[in-house]
Amino acid sequence: MLGIDARLFLVVAPILAAVSWAAFNIGRAAVGQLQLLIKRSRA
């Protein structure tokens, strides 16, 4: 039972890390774009 869980974890962990890293970068870029839009609309 543990062997299956360990293999599943080894497969899922890097995928989760990649997805969360991509989501973090996309979110940060989106926040930057929103801040630019807000600054432009005020100016």
From Swiss-Prot:
Disulfide bonds: none annotated. GO terms for cellular component: photosystem II; plasma membrane-derived thylakoid membrane. It is found in: Cellular thylakoid membrane. It is a single-pass membrane protein. InterPro entries: PSII_PsbY. GO terms for biological process: photosynthesis. The chain crosses the membrane at residues 8-26. The keyword Aminoacyl-tRNA synthetase does not apply. The keyword Zinc-finger does not apply. It holds the Pfam family PsbY. Its main location: membrane. GO terms for molecular function: manganese ion binding. Keywords: Membrane, Photosynthesis, Photosystem II, Thylakoid, Transmembrane, Transmembrane helix. PSII is composed of 1 copy each of membrane proteins PsbA, PsbB, PsbC, PsbD, PsbE, PsbF, PsbH, PsbI, PsbJ, PsbK, PsbL, PsbM, PsbT, PsbX, PsbY, PsbZ, Psb30/Ycf12, peripheral proteins PsbO, CyanoQ (PsbQ), PsbU, PsbV and a large number of cofactors. It forms dimeric complexes. Loosely associated component of the core of photosystem II (PSII), it is not always seen in crystals. PSII is a light-driven water plastoquinone oxidoreductase, using light energy to abstract electrons from H(2)O, generating a proton gradient subsequently used for ATP formation. Belongs to the PsbY family. NCBIfam families: PRK13240.1. This is Photosystem II reaction center protein Y. It comes from Parasynechococcus marenigrum (strain WH8102). The gene is psbY.
